């Protein structure tokens, strides 16, 4: 106990033990470290939870997009087969409009395993855990779409709404057509994906037009799939696997080559711009 200048009594704690002071400082440091660790753990859990939420949403969107595209593609093909009310160009138009609508409404969905695999191969898309989840969602959406088509349309067993190579052309020509069409489609997709000026609506219309136009060209030979999910869903539900390997291998191989061509063109633009001393506003490509 002591007295200050005003004559008031003030309690003074005197620490006479240096070791005690050291222990107190260490305890304070330990407490601060634990508080920081707890805060970091809470932030980590919150961030992880948010990331999982976004991943679940993306996978659900992928499944929904695949369902819509495959459902309306199959319905249009079945209407042509059952009633003859739609011509093949009209079927392609329905597919193009569906793709454009889905991309404009849901945003940058793939709804095509070949697209997802290509973006992952060129490191524009994470392999784990998104790649298997996206592909699984695409196939699940396709299967559900085909089951829904059967429930709504009730086709006969001889009605076919999938894609299969035309018998007279064998397998070589359908494979080549699917390969080339998939390569061109990937060039369009990569261009839209890396063009910052193209919004969802414009990009959706461009990709939808490409799908419809290419389908119109190669449809008489291969059915115009360019999408493994579009073929695998009907093949599994209907139990018809004629040439199904074509529609798995050709789109993936074609899109890998298409992305490579797109990258080569963009690289050549950069080289020319560098040699000419100008700048070219070209974003990265798959």
Curated annotation (Swiss-Prot):
Gene3D superfamilies: Glycerol uptake facilitator protein (1.20.1080.10). One of its GO terms (cellular component) is membrane. It comes from the Eukaryota. Keywords: Membrane, Repeat, Transmembrane, Transmembrane helix, Transport. A motif (NPA 2) lies at residues 227-229. InterPro entries: Aquaporin-like, Aquaporin_transptr, MIP, MIP_CS. Expressed in leaves and at lower levels in roots. A motif (NPA 1) lies at residues 112-114. Disulfide bonds: none annotated. It is found in: Membrane. The chain crosses the membrane at residues 59-79, 86-106, 133-153, 173-193, 201-221, 241-261. One of its GO terms (molecular function) is channel activity. It is a multi-pass membrane protein. PANTHER family: AQUAPORIN NIP2-1, AQUAPORIN NIP4-1-RELATED. Aquaporins contain two tandem repeats each containing three membrane-spanning domains and a pore-forming loop with the signature motif Asn-Pro-Ala (NPA). Aquaporins facilitate the transport of water and small neutral solutes across cell membranes. Belongs to the MIP/aquaporin (TC 1.A.8) family. NIP (TC 1.A.8.12) subfamily. This is Aquaporin NIP4-1. It comes from Oryza sativa subsp. japonica (Rice).
């Amino acid at each position: 106990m002591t007295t200050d200048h005003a004559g008031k009594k003030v309690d003074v704690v005197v620490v006479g033990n240096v070791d005690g002071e050291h222990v107190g400082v260490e305890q304070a440091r330990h407490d601060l470290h634990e508080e920081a660790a707890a805060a970091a753990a809470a932030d980590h859990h919150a961030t992880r939870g948010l990331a999982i939420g976004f991943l679940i949403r993306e996978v659900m969107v992928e499944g929904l997009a695949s369902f819509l595209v495959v459902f309306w593609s199959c319905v249009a093909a079945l209407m042509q087969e059952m009633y003859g009310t739609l011509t093949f160009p009209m079927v392609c138009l329905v597919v193009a409009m569906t793709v454009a609508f889905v991309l404009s409404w849901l945003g940058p969905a793939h709804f095509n395993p070949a697209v997802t695999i290509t973006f992952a191969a060129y490191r524009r898309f994470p392999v784990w855990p998104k790649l298997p989840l996206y592909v699984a969602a695409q196939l699940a959406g396709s299967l559900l779409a085909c089951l829904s088509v059967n429930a709504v349309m009730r086709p006969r067993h001889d009605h076919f709404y999938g894609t299969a190579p035309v018998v007279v052309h064998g397998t070589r020509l359908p494979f080549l057509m699917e390969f080339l069409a998939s390569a061109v489609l990937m060039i369009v997709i990569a261009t839209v994906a890396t063009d910052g000026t193209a919004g969802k609506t414009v990009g959706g219309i461009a990709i939808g037009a490409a799908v419809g136009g290419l389908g119109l060209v190669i449809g008489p030979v291969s059915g115009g799939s360019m999408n493994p999910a579009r073929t695998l869903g009907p093949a599994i539900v209907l139990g018809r696997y004629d040439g199904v390997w074509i529609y798995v291998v050709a789109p993936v191989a074609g899109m890998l080559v298409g992305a490579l061509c797109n990258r080569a063109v963009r690289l050549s633009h950069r080289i020319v711009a560098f040699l000419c001393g100008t700048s070219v506003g070209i974003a990265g490509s798959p």
